[in-house]
C-alpha cells in the first residue's frame, strides 16, 4: 500500500513541477471533465463516506483496507494507467489541467483519510503536496479538516460501468497471459456474453476495454451474463 501510494505521488510530482502546476488556476467544473475523472472523483467521495463511517464505528482496520483498495485498484492501476498520456502531452490544455486537479485532489484526500492510521507517512506526503500549492494553510495533515463527502459527485451507475470495464479487461488480459500472447500484439475480436443491462453498460466503456486489452472489436453475445 505505501509503495503504491508513494509511486503514484512520484508519478504526479515530476510532471506537475515540469508544467508549473500549483493549483492556482480556477477549478475545471466536474461536469466538464472527462468521464474517467468523474468516475475517480465519484469513487473518492464514496471512499470518504465509507472511511468516515468506519472511523465512527472504531473500525480502523476496515478503513485501511478500503483506502488500500482505492489506491491500488482504482487510482494507481486504473486511473493513472489510463491517463498517463494526458500528463505526457505537450501544452497546458484544459484536459491536462483537469487531470492534474483530479489526481491532486485524490492524493491530498487519501493523505487526510489515512492520517489517523498512518500519521507520519500521511503527514510527509500531505506536506509535500501542499508545500507547492498552499491550498491548506496548515503545518500538518493532522491540523487539516477531515474530508467531507460530496454526495452530488457520487454516480453509482458510472462506478458500476467502470467496475465492469475493469473486470472484463482483467479477464481479457488473463486470457492473453494464459495463452502467451503479449499485450502489444493486437487481437481481432473479444466475445462477451451479456444480458441487456450488461450490454448497455459495457457499450459505454467499450473503447476503454479495447484499448486496455488491445483488441480491434468487441462482439456482445446475447445471453445470460455472470
Residue ranges and their predicted role:
Residues 1-226:
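Feature 926 captures the class I aminoacyl-tRNA synthetase adenylation module centered on the KMSKS loop
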Amino acid at each position: 500500500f505505501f509503495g503504491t501510494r508513494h509511486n503514484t505521488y512520484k508519478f504526479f510530482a515530476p510532471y506537475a513541477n515540469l508544467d508549473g502546476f500549483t493549483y492556482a488556476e480556477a477549478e475545471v467544473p466536474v461536469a466538464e471533465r472527462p468521464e474517467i475523472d468523474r468516475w475517480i472523483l465519484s469513487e473518492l467521495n464514496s471512499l470518504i463516506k465509507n472511511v468516515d463511517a468506519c472511523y465512527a464505528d472504531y473500525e480502523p482496520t476496515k478503513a485501511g483496507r478500503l483506502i488500500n483498495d482505492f489506491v491500488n485498484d482504482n487510482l494507481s492501476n486504473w486511473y493513472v494507467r489510463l491517463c498517463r498520456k494526458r500528463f505526457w502531452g505537450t501544452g497546458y490544455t484544459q484536459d491536462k489541467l483537469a487531470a492534474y486537479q483530479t489526481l491532486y485532489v485524490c492524493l491530498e484526500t487519501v493523505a487526510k483519510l489515512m492520517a489517523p492510521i498512518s500519521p507520519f507517512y500521511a503527514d510527509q506526503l500531505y506536506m509535500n503536496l501542499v508545500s507547492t500549492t498552499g491550498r491548506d494553510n496548515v503545518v500538518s495533515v493532522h491540523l487539516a479538516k477531515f474530508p467531507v463527502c460530496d454526495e452530488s459527485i457520487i454516480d453509482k451507475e458510472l462506478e458500476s460501468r467502470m467496475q465492469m470495464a475493469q473486470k472484463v479487461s482483467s479477464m481479457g488480459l488473463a486470457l492473453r497471459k494464459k495463452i502467451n500472447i503479449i499485450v502489444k500484439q493486437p487481437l481481432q475480436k473479444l466475445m462477451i456474453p451479456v444480458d441487456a443491462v450488461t450490454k448497455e453498460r459495457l457499450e459505454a466503456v467499450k473503447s476503454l476495454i479495447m484499448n486496455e486489452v488491445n483488441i480491434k472489436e468487441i462482439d456482445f453475445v446475447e445471453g445470460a451474463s455472470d
